[in-house]
Amino acid sequence: MQIDISLVKQLRDATFAPLGDCKNALVEANGDLELAQEILRKKGIAKAGKKADRETNEGLIKTHNDGIRTYVVKLLCETDFVAKNDSFLGLFDKIFDVLKTVSGDVESQDDLPADVVEKINNLIAEGIATTGENLKLGGVHVTGSKVYAYSHPGDKVVSLVYHNGDDNVAKELALQIAALNPDYLSFDEVPADEKAKLEAQFTEELKAAGKPENMIANIVKGKVDKAFADNVLLEQEYIRDGGKKVKEILPAGFEITKFYRFSV
């Protein structure tokens, strides 16, 4: 049957599928736009299954704020070429739209309802059919809390700072997190077993070196703190002034409650 070119363009705009695939799907669907979308979706799922084992070492991370909540989506692909492709980039807005239907905060994709996961998986399957590469959802985050979101140029690193103060200060922290990738906010967050392992190691070393028993505990504490300092945000050297620790740049009353860092 003859398919109107305007229908082909509509389907292309909705799915990002190649024009030839759009035309064939419309022919198969007898011009029914919704049915043609479903045909493309099913073909995408079939292609997705064949590509599922291929490694996805490239991708991008995008953020979005709708005035109510902040959204982060990490989407992975096989090559940097596809990461710059309009079809790949268009998936982010579609996934953001799906995430807007979720109530409450989301720390990771494990928190997503099953129906939302299915919708996102269908979008990714369509993306696989369009780009010809394996695509995967690498992470999501949704929050209605006060956060500062920083996207490093190139969209390969994003950091989120949950805070109750000045956004300019939060921005400095977000830059610090993006650059130096700490695991913990403060020494209090370092797991007790990790501390205990180092304490035991340093204690044995100091005893073997003949240090007085009454001095060992204080020396061990200092050595343990120093060992973890590079991995604790508040104890790191401030990237703009190595003579200061991050905690020393925080104004009175400023509080950071937690942070996240996403990277490709």
Language-model-detected regions and their locations in the chain:
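N-terminal assembly/interaction segments in proteins that build large macromolecular machines
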Residues: 2-264
